[in-house]
């Protein structure tokens, strides 16, 4: 099955599938899966010497306000392979704006059928403070050395906001 055939989830917005593009702790290379071919492309080499603090991917069959599928960060005990799909539960969203407009990043944890490690995490506030600080710091600075690019982090919102983002982006993609 091609990655573009992966559904958005098992039971939106509570139970989602995230297609991983970049593993946690990866080198500063921005990968993107081409939505038409399902191939993993190098989007760019990041100028800052930073690594992704979580696995990074997207929810298929969604369309966020920036014109791309909804971005999702997935903390896991181990880095995931690019192109893998993980079943998750949304717990929050980091609201941001960049040079292209609004750019929210959802945070979702692995479903309890995969690991019990995140069962206590019901909302972004339940994540470790250090992890939230690392995520925020990464997105505040990962474009610092790229001419004409910038990011403004507006702050964290809860699981309800993440679920609302999933539903609205799913409806937007159907139009």
From Swiss-Prot:
Binding site residues for substrate: 30, 44, 56, 142
Keyword annotations: Cytoplasm, Hydrolase, Magnesium, Metal-binding
Top EC group: hydrolase
Enzyme Commission designation: 3.6.1.1
Signal peptide: none
One Gene Ontology cellular component: cytosol
Recorded GO MF terms: inorganic diphosphate phosphatase activity; magnesium ion binding
Oligomeric and partner information: Homohexamer.
PANTHER family tied to this protein: INORGANIC PYROPHOSPHATASE
Record protein name field: Inorganic pyrophosphatase
Organism of origin: Yersinia pestis
């Amino acid at each position: 099955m091609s990655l573009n055939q992966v559904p958005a989830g098992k039971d939106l917005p509570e139970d989602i599938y995230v297609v991983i593009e970049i593993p946690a702790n990866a080198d500063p290379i921005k990968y993107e899966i081409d939505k038409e071919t399902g191939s993993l492309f190098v989007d760019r080499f990041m100028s800052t010497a930073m690594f992704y603090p979580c696995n990074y991917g997207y929810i298929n069959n969604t369309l966020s306000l920036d014109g791309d599928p909804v971005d999702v960060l997935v903390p896991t005990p181990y880095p995931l392979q690019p192109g893998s799909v993980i079943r998750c539960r949304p717990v929050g969203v980091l609201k941001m704006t960049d040079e292209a407009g609004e750019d929210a990043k959802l945070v979702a944890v692995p479903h309890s059928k995969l690991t019990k490690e995140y069962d206590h995490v019901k909302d972004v506030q339940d994540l470790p403070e250090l992890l939230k600080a690392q995520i925020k710091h990464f997105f505040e600075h990962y474009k610092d050395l790229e001419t004409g690019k910038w990011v403004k982090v507006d702050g964290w919102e809860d699981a309800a906001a993440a679920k609302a983002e999933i539903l609205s982006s799913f409806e937007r993609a159907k139009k």
